[in-house]
Amino acid sequence: MKKCLTLLIATVLSGISLTAYAAQPMSNLDSGQLRPAGTVSATGASNLSDLEDKLAEKAREQGAKGYVINSAGGNDQMFGTATIYK
């Protein structure tokens, strides 16, 4: 029982630390506090939620603190771009 509790606590704490460093979606109004640092693009998503997840992951990989999705489109395969901010 004690090992299960320890494992549960470790899992929760590791999840908290990962979300603290994840790039967050922003509105254009929020972006005034940060500087644009480039763009990221993603393709091959099956829906808009998957596309947003792919763009967020690419923004995080670039060290962004936030991102604004500029474009999204497609039918069977979604594609999109986002401006990243640091």
From Swiss-Prot:
Belongs to the BhsA/McbA family. Gene3D superfamilies: Flavin-binding protein dodecin (3.30.1660.10). One of its GO terms (biological process) is response to stress. Induction: Repressed by McbR. Disulfide bonds: none annotated. This is Uncharacterized protein McbA. Affects biofilm formation and mucoidy. It is found in: Periplasm. Pfam families: YdgH_BhsA-like. Residues 1-22 form the signal peptide. Keywords: Periplasm, Signal. It comes from the Bacteria. One of its GO terms (cellular component) is periplasmic space.
